[in-house]
Every structure is written in C-alpha cells, then in structure tokens.
Amino acid sequence: VSDRIPQRILDALTDVPMPRLPEPLAPDDTILCGDQRVPLYRCGALVIGSGAAGLRAAVEIRRRGGDVAIATQSAWGGTSACSGSDKQTLHTANTADAGDDYRAMAQALRAGGAMDADTAYIEAVGSVRAMASLQYLGLPLPQDRLGGTLRYQTDHDETGRATSCGPRTSRLMVKVLAEEALHLGTPVHNHTTAVRILVDGGRVTGVLAVRPRSESAENPHGFVLFACNALVLAAGGPGELYRDSVFPNGCFGSLGLALEAGLELVNLTESQFGIGTRREGFPWNLSGTYVQVIPYIYSRDAEGAEHNFLADYYRSTQELASNVFRKGYQWPFHAERMLDFRSSLVDLAIVREGQKGRRVFMDFNRNPAPVPGSAPFSLDRLDPDVAAYLRAAGASQALPIDRLRHMNPLAIELYRRYKVDIAAEPLEFAVNNQHMNGGIAVDTWGRTSLPGVYAVGEAAGTHGATRPGGSALNAGQVFGTRVGEHIGASGFARTPPAGAVAGAAAVVAEICALLRPETGVPVQDIRTEVQARMSDAAGILCVPEDVSTALSEARALNARLCQSGVAPRRKGEVGRALQWRQMALASEAVLTALDTYIAGGGGSRGARAICDPAGEALPQARTGPLADVRFRKERAADKTHQLVLRMEGEAMTVKARPNRAFDADSRAFFERDWPDWLTGAVFDLESDAPAAADQPG
C-alpha cells in the first residue's frame, strides 16, 4: 500500500487476533426457581461486558485479590473491539515536550459544560497512569526517537493530546487487557446476556442472565444465575437505539437493565453524531485523514443523477474544501458549527440530502467539484490552517486517494479487509449516532446509586455535552482502575457470597410472564419502531413538538409491552427479546430527559440543535438562510447542571443537580493526607458497606 510502511506492519495493525477463551466453567450449583432448574455461579465481583473498560476493571479487581468473573454477550465483539476510525484516538495528558497541566486538561474535558469538575480532574491526572499501564501490557503507542509519545489534534482538542496505534487502537487495548485477564485466571462466561439485577435490602445480590447453551427441558429459556457481592456494569452504550448508527450490530448497553433496577441515569440528553459508513456494511467513523485528504462528496438521486450538494451551502470552492478538511478534527456534529459557514454545515447538508431520499458518497479519486462561479479546487487555494497541515504532512499529491495513501495507508487497508476498495470505488456514508455521553450516574469511585453496583466505560455517564476525541477510551481505563481499587479496598470481592439468592425465583417468574411467543409484541416490531423514532425525532435536529410526540409514542409502546409482553421469534432469542424490552425503556428515558430539557427552555449544544422558529441562531447557506433549521442557542446556566433520571414504578422522573465542584486551588499535603491513604479513608467505604451477613470472611 505504501513504500513507507511494509505490508507486514499494516497487517499487524489492521488484523488484530484476539485470545482464545478457556473451556466454560461448570456451575457451582443448580437451584430451583419455580419449575425451572437454573445453573448458579458464585463470585465476589461480576463484570458485565468484555470491552476495554470492563476488562480493565476485572484485571484491577483480580490484581487486588478479588474473586472476579466476566459475563459477556459476545466476547471481544463489542464497541471497543469492533469500532474505530482512520487513526482511533486515545486522549491522555501530553507526556512529550514540556509535559502537561492536569488542571488545564480537566478544564478542556469539561469545557462543553454539564460535567463534574472532580471527574474531569480524575480523568486528567489518571490518564498518564492508564496510558503507561497499557504500554506495559504491550499496547504499541508510537514514540519519537527520544521516548516521547507522538501526538496530534483531535475533536474539541486545542492542545494536541491525542495519540493512536492506528485504526484499531481500542481493539489493541482489548487484546492486551484480555490477555492479562486470562493470564490472571479470570473466568469469562461468553454468550451470556444479563437481563435483571437482583437486589435485596437495598443492595445488589446478583444477576439473572440467559445463555442459549443452558437451555434444557428443565430450563427452557436458558436462565443462568450469578450471585455476587459487587457488580460492574461495563456493557457499553445503547448502539441499537438508532436506525442510523455506526455502532457494531448487537450493542445494547445496559441503560434499560439499570433503569429496571432503579439506578439513576444522568445526561441522557448528550450524545455524539458524526459521519461514518453504515453498519449494514462495515460501520466505521470517517474522521481524521479520510476527510483531511479532501475527497469529493456528492449525492445520487433515485434516477442515478449526481448532485454536488455542498456547493449549495458554501460560498466558494476554497471554503467548501477547507471545511471538509476540518471534519477531520471537528468530526462530531456541533450545533454552533452550523453557523458562519463552518464545518457542521457539512453534516447538516448530508442529513438534508438523506431527507430527500438521496444517497451520499465520498469519492477518493476526485477532488471537490467547484462551487458555481468560484475557482476550481486547488491545493494552493485553501484556508491557511488547512494548507499548513497538508504542507507539514507532505500531502501535495494530485488526488485524494494518493494523499490518503501517503498520510495514512492503514485507512485504505482497513476497508479493503472488509471487501471495500475505496481506491477503486466511491464510499457511501451518512451522519450516524456514535456515542452516548450520558449514562449511569456514578461518583468519583465509579459507584452508582445502588450500593454494590459500579459502572465504567460508555455505560457510565461521566461526560458532558461535548468531549475531546479519545477521552472516552481514557475515562474507561481511569475509572476501570478506580473501581478495581475501590472494590479491592472494600474486600467485597475476596470471597463469593454463600447461601440462597433472595428474590431469584420471583424475578424468574416475572420474566417468564413477560415472554409470550404467541401473543406478545414481536421483537422486530419493537426494533423498527424504536430505531425509527429515535433517528427521526432525536437526532441532530430536534423539533420540540416532534420530541414530545415521540415521547408519547415511546410511553405507549412500553405500556403495550407491559400489558402484552414480548414475543421471541425463535428458540435462543429470549435474551434479544428482553434486550429490546430494555431498549424501549432506554428510548423513553432519553426522550423524557430531552423533552424535559427542551420544555424548560434548554437550547442547542453539542450533538443536537433545538429547532425553533423564534430561535436566535439562523444558519446560512450560499443559496440563502436555512429557516427550517433556525435554532435556540444554549443558555450559559445550563452548563452548570445535569439532568438526573430515575424510573419509579412505570414512571420516569427527572431532576436537575449542579455539577460537582473541584477546588482547583486546593493542595494536597503529604503528612496531612498520607494517613487517609494508609487507612483506606480515601475510599469512603462506610457509605456502602455490605450487610453483616454479606461481609467477606
């Protein structure tokens, strides 16, 4: 692919084999739940999910003497292992040149508002340790000749704190962490889907799951029970929530699971959307060099005619080309960037083409077509920041594909691995849902509102309205480590719980009553309705009336599911049916939070423009004002708090809470603060100690 990088290196960075799992463990016991005989496993701590964050938590618990197991729907098959971009980013404090300022980094992490200041500082100061430990495990982060980590600029990053192993950074992270987890003897229960958290006395006692291989005449639904003292939710984000999604197929996350257990969720209004290839083929983010080489973006109508549609939006070819380039490091849609002919006008234009029934393509064998009345495309006619970047990269080649081959041959090689040759044919793409910034509410140790339950990774709502690219991978590592430290200090996980699992039989009976193969709502109907509603009403353009209508429809669907149940289509689909029931709850939760925010006067920020005929902001195009997307601006006061949602019975309640503060002027003092570390006072263990009967021996 390139004379600069040998093929064997390209292969190693794109084809990343994962470790083989050991043989499944036999259950510790079998218990009778009604008329079902259910296998029972006991562990001190259970991690749900096998992505980078969950594996980090499992490794850190194991290193501290914990008896930990992992339960996963598909080992090495989630977002961490199967997603990426041109050079997938890990965002950490800069360890080269003059180093970094953790407080400045924390400020950058929460610059978009609605993020806790203490969390931002934790992610900043913990990032160096997280990166170093990954390097110790074998993650091949690039260095200069003197040992400094190579850096570049990414989304919402004015300093240049990004680094990368190439398009498969997170998969490589999963690989080294999985190898370590297996080396430490961590059991992995594969093809095991958690469907209900068990609670007794206000504390977690276990998890009910389903596993197809456990199906039998005495256990027709394949139930599996895990008894545990601590539970870590690390199943990622709700990728199936949207029709237009760049998540790998089958990523459900655990928001619905958390709602059913009464956990508090936070910042559900905050997501991330951006351009990428659809998951019907090979889902991948088209950020970085894919757009920095400035390919020709066009649409095709039903008759096959091509449309240079971006020329309707930008005033000159130079302006158009420069903003296509800027999508490389301004990749997520941002409402404010629709103004003044900036880069998110590209996203808006793509969405509007889709609404016309047109398909949108990126052609790497053609430079951008000119804007009418403007000069043709030329590398000599670009905005200064764009020209400087391409000059520094040595990207003076005539065609986008040659510039891409020079700047990042891995970007070409990756698609070729999935039978897509972008050097030979145009690439179809769209604006897709990519990340949930909100999630399960956690404190500074990753604890949720239910004692004994923790959340890490995309499952945890630690991000604000915006975030730097790659900061989510860092947050998962930092909080995975902190959760491991906290569980280790508590002693919860040293010994598995003994005795009966309270409430298991009642939960099994409740779920059996919900499963109605003959009369329930078909799984496909739930999927189609939820995904269409979320993509059409809760994407980058939100019309208040449409959001309210969507919420009413979501409530009606959940009421129908409560009354009629859900119908698995075939044997082995019980887990998927229950996940879609939970996804319907998650959809209602997101729409409830969004409707509350909008009804309270909330404005546009981050991923969503709140369209309003009386809005202060009016995007302009070359052809005139875009009145249909006039939008409200964000109120400064909304940056200072977050919306917390909880399900009580069948109703969802929302309340605002202020962002947690952090005293940037405070200073630790060794002699004063060392005793808190030595005694474990830093872990605040008194607030969630298990009942005496559950204390490890």
Predicted region positions:
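Glycine-rich loop(s) and the adjacent beta-strand/alpha-helix scaffold that form part
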Residues: 230-284, 470-486
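Extreme N-terminal leader/targeting segments of oxidoreductases
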Residues: 1-44, 165, 686-697
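Core beta-strand elements of the Rossmann-like FAD/NAD(P) dinucleotide-binding domain
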Residues: 40-43, 218-230, 449
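Long, amphipathic alpha-helical stalk/connector segments used for oligomerization, subunit docking
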Residues: 492-573
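N-terminal Rossmann-like FAD-binding beta1-loop-alpha1 element of flavoenzymes
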Residues: 43-70
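Glycine-rich FAD pyrophosphate-binding loop
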Residues: 63-84
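Conserved redox-cofactor binding core of oxidoreductases
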Residues: 22, 130-221, 234, 277-289, ...
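An anion/pyrophosphate-binding glycine-rich loop and adjacent beta-alpha core
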Residues: 264-410, 486
